[in-house]
Amino acid sequence: MSYFEHIPAIRYEGPQSDNPLAYHHYDPDKRVLGKTLAEHLRIAVCYWHTFVWPGHDIFGQGAFQRPWQQPGDALERARQKADAAFEFFTKLGTPFYTFHDTDVAPEGDSLRDYAANFARMVDYLGERQHASGVRLLWGTANLFSHPRFAAGAATNPNPDVFAWAATQVCHALDATHRLGGENYVLWGGREGYETLLNTDLKRERDQFARFLSMVVEHKHRIGFKGALLIEPKPQEPTKHQYDYDVATVHGFLVQYGLQNEIRVNIEANHATLAGHSFHHEIANAFALGVFGSVDANRGDPQNGWDTDQFPNSVEELTLAFYEILRHGGFTTGGMNFDAKVRRQSIDPEDLFYGHVGAIDVLALALERAAVLVENDRLDALRRQRYAQWDDAFGRKILSGGYTLESLAADALARGVNPRHASGAQERLENIVNQAIYGLR
């Protein structure tokens, strides 16, 4: 059975085409900086927003009528969902996908049900991967939707909830390994608090760290070679989450000695909620040595919640890709579309329109970022700004050649009177615009 029989395979037709079901800028085989666009972008489609979300919101019930979401045998519906998903991936031409455990398999009424159902669906996903050539970018466990996780999973006051969560992660990590996944993501959607009046912050942080340490140990025990990634988010669904942003996650990892084991998966909309730009979070991740992967989407700056819209800003993504490219590009990570169509977009074609347009935006942004990397104008000005630190005096400070007292004495003896230099922000912004809009 075909779920998208009236929709052709999406092909590159070029910028002059007016076909809404074609790529206008994404030519997967086009080479940029020595790699194809497909190799650079490593695009993934997420299971949850695309095939699981029924189109509901807090004010209304599901608006979609997906065949695989209708009442019936839960495992049969899960197989239909997988069939629809892999038909979608294949027609879109995207090389990767991502999932939560309970996206792909019914949870059932017990842990035994969960394990049995998930095992059956992992077998089925393996068959679909083999037949299609589509690969798993990352897997994860849903430790936030069920009421048992209302007070958190790893940070829950009940150790039985901790144990249930550990069981899910154990199975999800095993499944990711078996399916050839390149990363495993840990998003602590409920790892936070609603009120400090009933919260022991130190205890919950210690519990979370213990949980992560167990995941790290299991990764090595089973021989999983992929990366473990935490996905930062400041709030929603909790008032305050412990993985607030990249810097917070890094500090947490350092505190518990996990900084060499876990990196970050950065979502654009989560950066918005944390009061940061997407560019900031990616640059910070590289500066701290924890960059892993990206969830590509956008938020609405007028809304204080996670809208998970498809990315549509070449300007925003150019700066994000500039950081990624100048640091060598993705290794195990990629661009996962953690994005959903709007509730009124009920037609099957809308799923394609959203992804096709966003993929074109990624391609445009990456090519513009490549211009910035190739012409080296931004980096040259940055190097010039800090050039004095590469002189003998600057190197001596950084290498420990001075104490605070001896440096002060040296400054007094030389009569230091430094002059302020221009930051040249306007010039730098012009360089970016020239690259984005094709001026040079």
Curated annotation (Swiss-Prot):
GO terms for molecular function: magnesium ion binding; xylose isomerase activity. The active site is at H100, D103. Binds 2 magnesium ions per subunit. Mg(2+) 1 binds at E231, E267, D295, D338. Its EC number is 5.3.1.5. The keyword Protein biosynthesis does not apply. InterPro entries: Xyl_isomerase-like_sf, Xylose_isom_bac, Xylose_isomerase. It is an enzyme of class 5 (isomerase). Mg(2+) 2 binds at E267, H270, D306, D308. Its cofactor is Mg(2+). It is found in: Cytoplasm. Keywords: Carbohydrate metabolism, Cytoplasm, Isomerase, Magnesium, Metal-binding, Xylose metabolism. One of its GO terms (cellular component) is cytoplasm. It comes from the Bacteria. GO terms for biological process: D-xylose metabolic process. The keyword Cytoplasm applies. It catalyses: alpha-D-xylose = alpha-D-xylulofuranose. Belongs to the xylose isomerase family. PANTHER family: PTHR48408, XYLOSE ISOMERASE (PTHR48408:SF1). Homotetramer. This is Xylose isomerase. It comes from Burkholderia orbicola (strain MC0-3).
